[in-house]
Each structure stands twice: as C-alpha cells, then as structure tokens.
Amino acid sequence: EKLCYVALDFEQEMQTAASSSSLEKSYELPDGQVITTGNERFRAPESLYQPSFLGMESSGIHETTYNSIMMCDVDIRKDLYANTVLSGGSTIFPGIADRMQKEITSLAPPTMKIKIIAPPERKYSVWIGGSILASLSTFQQMWISKQEYDESGP
C-alpha cells in the first residue's frame, strides 16, 4: 500500500518496468526483511480499472462511474462530470485522479468538461459522510432495530 500507485498508462508502465529497474523500490518488513517490488507497485491497483486481473467479471471503477452518470437525468450529467469526487481508502493511491480523468474523458462526450476532485481527507470521507448523515434528526426516522433487520434483511 505504501509503495503502490496508479499508472496513467498501464501498458507503457509495464514496458518501462520490463526494460529498466527505475520503478523498483525496496521496503523493510516489520521483521527486518527487505523486499524489492517492481511492477507489482502499479499492477495491484490496476485491478480497480481491470477487475479481470483478479478473475472478476465486472466493470472497472471508471466504467462504473461513467455508467452511473449515464443513468442520471440528462440535465445533471454535465454537473456530475464536472464534480466527480473520489472518496475512500482505495482512492489514496498516487496517480488515481489523473487516471480517472483520462479514463472518464475517453468515455464521455468529447465536449464534456471532466473534473475529478481528490480531497486530501478522502480516506475518511465515507466515514465522515455516514457520521453526518447518522447525526441528522431527519435520518432517525429511517433507523431500524436489529430485530427488524434480522426479520427483513438489508
């Protein structure tokens, strides 16, 4: 996690890793053992864009984002493209905002302005948002008991 990053161009990065050791980094494990990582640094987070690397038949994060926007009313799509906010721990990888910008731009209409927002506090944004929502008095009417949950499920 500390050494990983998202490649802007995965294939180009693979070629660079194959022809040079410039992408290699050493890391000391808690037991003192030192390991060297190469293309693993960007291959691991690439599964966010290519879940097939993990044997999953699902869309990448960029396609899921695009599909979500396209399912919204046509009148708000422009605003969604211009205000896509990254949140959660998986968005902490360096390079993820630039890659999302590139991928969404390639999927969206050519004249569309794309802006990916990666706030510094995004690692905890999901928790903070849930905390704010849970503290609203209007949200309390949506609460259910454990017994209700056990009976009806999610």
Swiss-Prot record:
What Enzyme Commission number(s) apply to this enzyme?
A: 3.6.4.-
Keyword Nucleotide-binding attached: yes
User: Keywords on this record?
Assistant: ATP-binding, Cytoplasm, Cytoskeleton, Hydrolase, Nucleotide-binding
Q: SMART domains recorded for this chain?
A: ACTIN
Superkingdom, natural source:
Eukaryota
Catalytic activity from the UniProt record: ATP + H2O = ADP + phosphate + H(+)
Q: Enzyme group, top EC level?
A: hydrolase
Annotated Gene Ontology cellular component terms: cytoplasm; cytoskeleton
Q: Which GO terms describe its molecular function?
A: ATP binding; hydrolase activity
Q: Where in the cell is it found?
A: Cytoplasm; Cytoplasm, Cytoskeleton
Protein function: Actins are highly conserved proteins that are involved in various types of cell motility and are ubiquitously expressed in all eukaryotic cells.
Query: Would you identify the family this protein belongs to, as annotated?
Result: Belongs to the actin family.
Q: What is this protein called?
A: Actin, cytoskeletal 4
Organism, by scientific name, is Lytechinus pictus (Painted sea urchin)
Taxonomic lineage per UniProt? Eukaryota, Metazoa, Echinodermata, Eleutherozoa, Echinozoa
